[in-house]
Amino acid sequence: MRADPTSTVLIVGASRGIGFETVKLALKAGHSVRALARSATAIRSRDPKLEKLDGDALDQHTMERALVGVDAVIQTLGVSPTPELIFSGTRLFSIATRILVNAMEVSTVRRLISVTGPIEE
């Protein structure tokens, strides 16, 4: 991936797992990164091209604010598998994606990569 030195990528679900690995790879590729997580202080990086943003991916207003000034979105939401969640499933991925796409429709952002977890909905 060749980075445009002025490109900014929003990574949703950036505090750990695939999300945090994606943050590291995007920074290494030269992108500026806006990392959204419920607890952005958990993101362990001090890279000057990293902007940490606390927020809830299920909140429309949060997603609209997070999209301002970004060129692309990588959605990497995950859940901690609990016995209840494994047997009942989750709608986190479908709901968050719907909210994100709605927010993108009123923004200028048109690029989206979404990585979801193994829990069936």
Annotate each language-model stretch with its function.
Residues 4-5, 29, 48, 68-69, ...:
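Residue-level preference for short coil/turn positions at secondary-structure junctions
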Residues 11, 35, 52:
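Conserved SAM-binding loop
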Residues 13-19, 30, 55, 69, ...:
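Glycine-centered flexibility sites
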Residues 15, 32-34, 40, 95-121:
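Conserved Rossmann-fold NAD(P)-dependent oxidoreductase catalytic core, especially the SDR/UDP-sugar
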Residues 6-8, 27-34, 38-46:
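N-terminal beta1-alpha1-beta2 submodule of the flavodoxin-like/Rossmannoid cofactor-binding fold
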Residues 8, 71-72, 111:
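Structural motif
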Residues 41-95, 99, 103:
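NAD(P)H-binding glycine-rich loop region in Rossmannoid oxidoreductase-like domains
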Residues 2, 7-29:
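N-terminal Rossmann NAD(P)H-binding glycine-rich loop of SDR-like oxidoreductase domains
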